[in-house]
């Protein structure tokens, strides 16, 4: 039975038992900024378990793509060296959200394993939490599991919690017994760490809520969260002991081996590369690009580890991108997004491999040189840091290499150097946010801003400095919560509305609107009278500002579609800011847009504006929206019911913002800037409507003023500037010629001052009134005319010294280097062995230093 068949059998089994099949969520979690990657099936359902979200179904089943590399769950260093560690794996899971509980969950698991997959019951072993008598009775009395293949375990192994507080509960685990020929004892025994008993399915029963004192309280609706690794299960079904021996891995391993010559199919490096092409490809599919921070750096580490193992196998570079097609062969049917992103994945992997290959050989030589000279078994932290900082070797890659030679790194010294670098750059992790620290308000507001810009409402909450109050006086700043509001709260990149809250005897100026919990919070200042609770008010949005925001937001949708059309389908929105005056749009792409691409994008968007398509909004469930072809934005969290925004057949996206009624309302679209903001992330700044017209007029005014300054017409401006540049170039050539002539004359004048010492022609000369460029020309002239030369030229002006030194290449290694000579004379400077420059204050003992240089030459 193939891995793909096992996956489908699992999903089919649970469909037949009333479960909703939910597609694998992105590897980048949308609902938990504390989590680096999706590492379990339950991640996309976290808010359901916490009671923060409801969906149309109470039973679900998934085949979830997971990554464990970086952060708390980091398997990277073990991948390839053990039978079951992976950076990427698939987790099969079934879930109940207040529907069925322990009995059905246990029955489903046992039936699927023994009756669908036909695993002999006598090869399975079951564990429960020692205090979970209910689960124990179900297993022993109802499922008739033999007490001899059953054990009770403690809280460490069989009790699960989401954190120190919150939902938690006991779990029951099912293990597969590989037989007595494999070392290891049953779970819970002193010998449990062996490989005989392998966990294949974990069933978590969330039935308690743990408070701050550690007390457990029963949940009103207990839930079930189960997880089973597909790779482990496939190994059991296919009768192999290592996950790397299953069909999908063997296909990849053989494809890798074919890229080289006479490679042993059991080579560890093949396993490493086979694992890493899976994680790297799917991370790129989900919008992660190699970078030097966050998720992008984890991806870079994995790619570089794979490239290093390819180098170890002697695979011709670039090789890594050639494995995308074999991966599609084994996983493309289940994950068609791999097929759609094939060219994009290959391009990113090849680009990253080419970049790293340039420094890999140098870094490996440096590392091997240090290993040869090691006195003990520990590589210094300084060397490891240099490999990291200069040659791009992630620390786990260096550790991987030296572990193969029985060595280890002085991690304390390495970490100290890393800390120094962090302090200097003031870099901080973006994943340390306390997601659960945001206070939740009990108030609820109903939003009417899609259809209204003004309405009557009642004040249900007042806040000052984060505290709820009963009144806010004139001149004071504060926040107002209404029962109903037309004000849009900042979300999805669109800024919050501004406007006024007006009563008979008061006025509150709204400067910003935010969503806190279920409440819409209006921040601002009382400009008339006094606000108190329960007052009736008239809420009026600044409709001129709102209209400008609408135009910009609708334009970002047209821009997104145009980018996909012109640049490529790999483009994903990675952020936006939609304000009244302009908008910015961040997107994933690996290089700057060309002027031609920017022009094409503007033409496409403005054509859609002229088409004057109606902007249609439909509310539907999330699955129907995705099936209709609507684009779901990267990293965005959606509820079950979503708003789908369509503009003809050109753009269809999920969006909760406010928009123009027709594309023609935008009037004009203009890109004013395009630049990179991070590795693999570009930003476009744009203007629309009257702001676009104002920008165009401003540019025309600038062009007219420039033309007047240059005494030409706007139409002749390019020709005039080209002529000025040509004239400037000719002047530079003339200056260079004069400098060369001056240098030749200066060089000829001082040739007679050469002093020969032990076959080396030494010339140390102070020059008067000569700039750095002429000094370099003079040095070049002298070096071309003097063999075996050590030449030092310097100038002194206003007690500042400028020095240049040159050494003939035939005596490099024999004579002091040019950089050494410069530093000896003036203390500062650097360069190559044959040419160096420096400068600084004039040393008091200048003559002594010149004498010391002569003595250095005499000692050769």
Swiss-Prot record:
HAMAP family: Ala_tRNA_synth_B. It is found in: Cytoplasm. Gene3D superfamilies: 2.40.30.130, 3.10.310.40, 3.30.54.20, 6.10.250.550, Bira Bifunctional Protein, Domain 2, Threonyl-trna Synthetase, Chain A, domain 2. This is Alanine--tRNA ligase. It comes from Legionella pneumophila subsp. pneumophila (strain Philadelphia 1 / ATCC 33152 / DSM 7513). SUPFAM superfamilies: Class II aaRS and biotin synthetases, Putative anticodon-binding domain of alanyl-tRNA synthetase (AlaRS), ThrRS/AlaRS common domain, Translation proteins. InterPro entries: aa-tRNA-synth_II/BPL/LPL, Ala-tRNA-lgiase_IIc, Ala-tRNA-ligase_IIc_anticod-bd, Ala-tRNA-synth_IIc_core, Ala-tRNA-synth_IIc_N, Ala-tRNA_ligase, Ala_tRNA_ligase_euk/bac, DHHA1_dom. Its cofactor is Zn(2+). Belongs to the class-II aminoacyl-tRNA synthetase family. It is an enzyme of class 6 (ligase). The gene is alaS. One of its GO terms (cellular component) is cytosol.
């Amino acid at each position: 039975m193939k891995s793909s068949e096992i996956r489908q059998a699992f999903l089919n089994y649970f469909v037949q038992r009333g479960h909703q099949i939910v597609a694998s969520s992105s590897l980048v979690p949308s609902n938990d900024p504390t989590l680096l990657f999706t590492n379990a099936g339950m991640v996309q359902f976290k808010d359901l378990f916490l009671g923060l979200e409801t969906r149309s179904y109470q039973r679900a089943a998934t085949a979830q793509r997971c990554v464990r590399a970086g952060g708390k769950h980091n398997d990277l260093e073990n991948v390839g060296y053990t039978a079951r560690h992976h950076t990427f794996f698939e987790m099969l899971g079934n879930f109940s959200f207040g529907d069925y509980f322990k009995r059905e969950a246990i029955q489903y698991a046992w039936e699927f394993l023994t009756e669908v997959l036909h695993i002999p019951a006598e090869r399975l072993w079951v564990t429960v939490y020692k205090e979970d008598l209910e689960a124990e009775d179900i297993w022993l009395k109802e499922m008739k599991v033999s007490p001899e293949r059953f054990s009770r375990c403690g809280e460490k192994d069989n009790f699960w919690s989401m954190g120190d507080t919150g939902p938690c509960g006991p779990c029951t685990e099912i293990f597969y017994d590989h037989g007595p020929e494999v070392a290891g004892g049953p779970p819970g025994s002193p010998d449990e760490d062996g490989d005989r008993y392998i966990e294949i399915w974990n069933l978590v029963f969330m039935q308690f809520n743990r408070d701050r004192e550690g007390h457990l309280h029963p949940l009103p609706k207990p839930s079930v969260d189960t997880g089973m690794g597909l790779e482990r299960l496939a190994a059991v079904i296919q009768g192999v002991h290592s996950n790397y021996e299953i069909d999908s891995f063997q296909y990849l391993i053989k494809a890798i081996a074919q890229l080289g010559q006479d490679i042993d199919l059991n080579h560890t490096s093949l396993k490493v590369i086979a694992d890493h092409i899976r994680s790297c490809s799917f991370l790129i599919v989900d919008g992660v690009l190699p970078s030097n921070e966050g998720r992008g750096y984890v991806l870079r580490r994995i790619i570089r580890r794979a490239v290093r193992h390819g180098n170890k196998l002697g695979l011709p570079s670039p090789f890594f991108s050639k494995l995308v097609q074999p991966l599609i062969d084994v996983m493309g049917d289940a994950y068609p997004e791999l097929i759609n992103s094939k060219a994009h994945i290959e391009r990113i992997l090849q680009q990253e491999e080419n970049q790293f290959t340039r420094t890999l050989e140098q870094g490996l030589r440096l590392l091997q040189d240090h290993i040869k000279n090691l006195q003990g078994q520990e590589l210094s932290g300084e060397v490891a840091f240099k490999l990291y900082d200069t040659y791009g070797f992630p620390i786990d890659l260096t550790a991987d290499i030296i572990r193969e030679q029985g060595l280890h790194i002085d991690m304390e010294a390495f970490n100290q150097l890393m800390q120094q670098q962090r302090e200097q750059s003031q870099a901080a992790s973006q994943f340390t946010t306390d997601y659960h620290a945001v206070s939740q308000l009990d108030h609820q507001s109903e939003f009417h801003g899609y259809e209204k810009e003004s309405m009557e409402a009642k004040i249900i909450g007042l806040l000052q400095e984060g505290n709820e109050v009963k009144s806010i006086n004139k001149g004071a700043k504060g926040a107002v919560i209404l029962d109903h509001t037309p004000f849009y709260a900042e979300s999805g990149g669109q800024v919050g509305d501004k406007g006024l809250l007006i009563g008979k005897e008061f006025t509150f100026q709204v400067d910003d609107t935010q969503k806190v919990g279920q409440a819409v919070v209006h921040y601002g200042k009382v400009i008339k009278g006094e606000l108190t609770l329960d007052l009736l008010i008239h809420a009026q949005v600044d409709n001129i500002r709102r209209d400008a925001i609408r135009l910009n937001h609708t334009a970002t949708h047209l821009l997104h579609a145009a980018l996909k059309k012109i640049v490529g389908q790999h483009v994903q929105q990675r952020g936006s800011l939609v304000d009244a005056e302009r908008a910015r749009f961040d997107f994933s792409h690996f290089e700057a847009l060309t002027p031609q691409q920017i022009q094409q994008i503007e033409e496409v968007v403005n054509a859609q504006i002229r088409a004057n398509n109606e902007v249609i909004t439909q509310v539907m469930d999330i699955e129907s929206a995705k099936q209709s072809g609507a684009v779901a934005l990267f990293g965005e969290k959606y509820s079950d019911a979503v708003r789908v925004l369509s503009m003809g057949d050109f753009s269809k996206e999920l969006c909760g913002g406010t928009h123009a009624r027709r594309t023609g309302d935008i009037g004009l679209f203009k890109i004013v800037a395009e630049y990179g903001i991070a590795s693999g992330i570009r930003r476009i700044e744009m203007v629309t409507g009257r702001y676009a017209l104002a920008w165009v007029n401003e540019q025309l005014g600038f062009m007219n003023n420039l033309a007047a300054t240059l005494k030409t017409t706007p139409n002749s401006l390019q020709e005039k500037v080209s002529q000025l540049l040509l004239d400037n170039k000719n002047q530079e050539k003339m200056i260079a010629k004069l400098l060369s002539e001056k240098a030749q004359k200066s060089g000829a004048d001082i040739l007679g001052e050469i002093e020969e010492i032990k076959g080396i022609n030494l010339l140390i000369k102070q020059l008067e009134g000569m700039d750095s460029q002429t000094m370099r020309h003079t040095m070049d002239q002298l070096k071309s005319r003097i063999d075996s030369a050590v030449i030092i030229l310097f100038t002194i002006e206003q007690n500042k010294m400028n020095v240049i030194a040159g050494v003939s290449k035939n005596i490099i290694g024999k004579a002091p280097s040019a950089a050494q000579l410069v530093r000896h004379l003036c203390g500062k400077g650097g360069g190559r062995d044959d040419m160096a420059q420096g400068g600084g204050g004039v040393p008091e003992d200048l003559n002594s230093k010149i004498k010391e240089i002569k003595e250095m030459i005499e000692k050769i």
